[in-house]
Amino acid sequence: MTLKELQIGKSAIVDAVGGAGALRQHFLDMGLIPGAEVTLVKLAPMGDPMELRIHGYELTLRLDDAAQITVTPTEKTPAVHAPVAEKMVEHPGLGEGGKYHTKEGEHPLPEDKTLTFALAGNQNCGKTTLFNQLTGSNQHVGNFPGVTVDRKSGAIKGHPETEVTDLPGIYSMSPYSSEEIVTRQFIIGEKPTGIINIVDATNIERNLYLTMQLMELDIPMVLALNMMDEMRGNGGTVRINKMEAMLGIPVIPISAAKNDGVDELVDHAVHVAKYQERPGRMDFCSEDDHGGAVHRCIHGILHLIEDHAKAAGIPVRFAATKLVEGDPRIEEALKLDPNEKEMIEHIIVQMEQERGLDRAAAIADMRFSFIQELVAQTVVKPHESKEQLRSNRIDQFLTGKYTAIPAFIAIMGLVFFLTFNVIGLFFQNLMEMGIDALTGVVDTALTNWNVNAAVHSLVIDGIFTGVGSVLSFLPIIVVLFFFLSMLEDTGYMARVAFVMDKLLRRIGLSGRSIVPMLIGFGCTVPGVMASRTLPSDRDRKMTILLTPFMSCSAKLPIYSLFAVAFFPKYAGLVMVLLYFTGILVGVLAALLLKSTVFKGEAVPFVMELPNYRLPGLKNVAQLLWEKARDFLQRAFTVIFGATIIIWFLQNFDLRLSLTVDPQTSILARIAGDIAPLFAPLGFADWRISTALISGFMAKESVVSSLLVLFGSTAALTAALTPAQAAPLLVFCLLYTPCIAAVASVKRELGGKWAAIMVVNQCAVAWLCALLVRLVAVAVF
């Protein structure tokens, strides 16, 4: 039978994994190997995908992919909770013996050499928390060479001679996703002096799969065993010294969230890097396992490729196992001649016949077999964790068949309600009061000092009116990002992807696409960047092109201004309708793209469902500060510049003389040439055209431009009717995103796709606004 036919609550043993290429390798890397026991936990509310439990963690899989995996039903193996016969052996300090501790006669690296570290680990293992604990505020953000994946680096606190780079969260070193490719290229290409591998102690079997591949790179390495507080709290423990002896690298128990053990981790990391103490073990295949087939295969290939690996700068053990797996990138990098390729292929075929497994499955089985032996000897299994039980109870509601969709709508509705009507609104009002008070003080001072009228106008009408009106929306943006980051860090966003996968597949997307698009409600730029986690190029492009339809928070000032001014009784309803309009148009655009440019099926949905956890306040605060800082930088650079330029163009004519009549200004002349394009939409006013142009620089500047040009909200309401305001709102909702978002799309997809997106968004906005105009004329 196939995994697709397994009943809910039943278990089975995997017999064979079908499929081919990178996807099949990804299945194997995630633990779906012959001989593994899987249990079907449940199906998504819409019947697809399924949730499995394997190697102690939850994995999602579509039914179509499950149909390619053959299984044999079995009774679920009861969990064995060995009694904790001894306390966990405390980890020895430096100099107390062991391969990786201080030895006489060593030759450390020069004192002036910067110790560079790669921080690597699975997703949801606490890597970001540890990075923040290690670096504090000593962080800077860049990009990995040649790609658009963010690169966060920083010096370890108290160690200015170090630099640690936070690598993307990955499950293996196979080239399945852009994150895995980036990690591999960084470690092999930049050759850090050390690796800090963080492992989730509560999910140790899956996490150690990456550890074994990192050890094959022959780079000094320490293992940070994170969440040990949870492990102990559930009655489990780890025999640290025994694990160190079996792995040949330092193992340090830590709790990144509580900052426990981090100082010791830093001491060991600096030590192994300074003295270049490499892993004491890289060979994980036993000579006795199935006649030593895998052992002979790997060692035979090692001798054949040693010179090629050295010339290519690739660790030979890593290159050998990747060749056995069938990694095309490694094979290409080694530049083997035809005779060598034929000999290697012969060795691999011989191994497959002796082992009874194909090449990729044999390597995956070798790794998991060693992990099982390691865990059996070093880990005292805890009782079912409190975190797992809590997650199961929460999931009964949040991913339940009849409750998942209503819960999602309610949660997102609550987020927007609290953001726009309660918390965000409260702080926004405080900010506005402060800005108004400061404006009054400055205005009075300038008047008393008899400052030149032009300068007075620039400061009050230009800077304070423009930038001040935008700054007042900072609280709303920060509050919205707070809620979205909380939902993501707790693990709920992964559940949303699980619940929504079947629905999104109907419009040509994967359930994973929901996360970038939801982030797009906060800001299009991080939404576009979040698409990097999607393994399929097709899904990435579609998601990026659709994300701008999700109304970003920078447009809130526009909605708020027009909704309150023109539809005061229905302001809240108008704003909700705008958001749903953006979603509806995005769905229609997706269906069009699916049937034209991006034909084909969405990428398979293979994803881990982590336990629910409350994110650390320090991590959330760090994220919010980064978002607020980014907004403030834009407010005082792009928006500040746009405000001054618009003020200048509005107040001077072509002779550069101060103008009394705004219609004779430079701005009026430029905008007047564009205004006829908007005549069918009902707002052929040069001032509105100007504001829309400024919105391309930053959406926040639309409001500031309108207030500068019209002089006040009252003047704006006098100039427009509700039948004109409605299509204008829809146009603002859908037309091209700001230049920062366009630049993000250009970085991700190239200039061609960015230009196509700008043109398409403007065309769609114009057509939808025209439709709304026709309806509005009939209604109002």
Summary of predicted features, one role per range:
Residues 1-80:
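Compact, glycine-rich, soluble single-domain proteins
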Residues 90-172, 190:
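Conserved G1/Walker A P-loop phosphate-binding module
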Residues 159, 184-251, 558:
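Conserved C-terminal guanine-recognition region of P-loop GTPase G domains, centered on the G4
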Residues 222, 232-383:
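Alpha-helical transmembrane helix bundles of large polytopic membrane transport and channel proteins
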Residues 354, 361-365, 381, 425-463, ...:
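Extended, low-charge hydrophobic alpha-helical regions
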Residues 398-498:
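Core alpha-helical transmembrane segments of integral membrane proteins
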Residues 433, 437-441, 494-524, 599-623, ...:
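Juxtamembrane inter-helical linkers in multi-pass membrane proteins
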Residues 553-576, 740-750, 769-780:
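Transmembrane helix-loop junctions at the membrane interface of multipass transporters and ion channels
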